[in-house]
C-alpha cells in the first residue's frame, strides 16, 4: 500500500518538479502551491518564505544523498569514497535540477549552502581519516565532484556509456 507523502514532502516534490520542468527562475510560492494542489497559505505554513523552501530542498537533497551513501556502504565492503561515488551515480535528473537551482540561488545568498558546506567538510574528513593514501582519496573525491558538476551544468563531454565505464 502506498503511503501518501506528508505535506512538506509533497511541497518539496512539487518544487523539484517545477525546477525540472521550467527551471529555477520559475520557482515561486504560488507555483509550488499550484503544482502541489495546495493553497498558498498551506505552502507558507510549512515554508514561510522562498528562502526556507530552498533550505528545505537542500536539506532533502543532503538527506537523500547521505541515505544513498549509507546504502552503498552497507551493500559493499569498501571505503566511503567508493560509496560516495556510487551515490553520485544514483542521482536522479530531478535531484540534479534541484541542486542546480540551489546553486543558482546561492549566488544571491551564499549562506544557503552552509548545510552543504558542513556536509562536504564532514565527508572529506571521513574519506581522509579512513584512507591509506589520503592524497589519492582526496583527488578521487575532487574528481568525482568535478564530474558531477560538469554533468549538472550539462558540460560533460562524455556519453552515458563512457561515464559508466569510469566506475
Where are these regions (language model features)?
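N-terminal intrinsically disordered/low-complexity leader segments
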Residues: 1-6
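Helix-turn-helix
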Residues: 10, 14, 18-52
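Solvent-exposed, amphipathic alpha-helical segments
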Residues: 14-22, 68, 143-150
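Alpha-helical DNA-contacting segments of helix-turn-helix folds
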Residues: 54-61, 68
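Hydrophobic alpha-helical connector segments
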Residues: 63-100
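Short alpha-helical scaffolding segments that buttress acidic/His motifs in well-ordered protein cores
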Residues: 84-88, 99-104, 140-147
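Conserved, surface-exposed functional patches that form binding/active-site neighborhoods
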Residues: 91-97, 104-105, 109-121
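Hydrophobic/aromatic-rich alpha-helical bundle segments in the mid-to-C-terminal region
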Residues: 110-167
Amino acid at each position: 500500500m502506498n503511503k501518501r507523502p506528508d505535506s512538506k514532502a509533497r511541497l518539496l516534490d512539487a518544487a523539484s518538479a517545477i525546477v525540472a520542468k521550467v527551471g529555477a527562475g520559475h520557482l515561486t510560492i504560488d507555483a509550488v502551491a499550484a503544482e502541489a494542489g495546495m493553497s498558498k497559505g498551506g505552502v507558507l505554513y510549512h515554508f514561510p518564505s522562498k528562502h526556507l523552501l530552498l533550505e528545505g530542498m537542500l536539506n532533502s537533497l543532503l538527506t537523500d544523498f547521505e541515505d544513498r551513501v549509507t546504502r552503498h556502504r552497507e551493500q559493499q565492503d569498501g571505503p566511503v569514497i567508493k560509496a560516495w561515488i556510487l551515490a553520485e551515480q544514483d542521482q536522479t535528473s530531478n535531484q540534479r535540477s534541484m541542486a542546480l537551482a540551489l546553486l543558482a540561488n546561492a549566488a544571491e545568498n551564499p549562506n544557503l549552502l552552509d548545510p552543504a558546506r558542513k556536509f562536504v567538510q564532514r565527508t572529506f574528513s571521513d574519506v581522509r581519516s579512513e584512507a591509506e593514501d589520503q592524497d589519492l582519496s582526496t583527488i578521487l573525491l575532487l574528481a568525482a565532484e568535478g564530474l558531477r558538476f560538469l554533468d549538472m551544468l550539462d558540460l560533460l563531454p562524455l556519453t552515458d556509456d563512457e561515464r559508466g565505464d569510469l566506475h
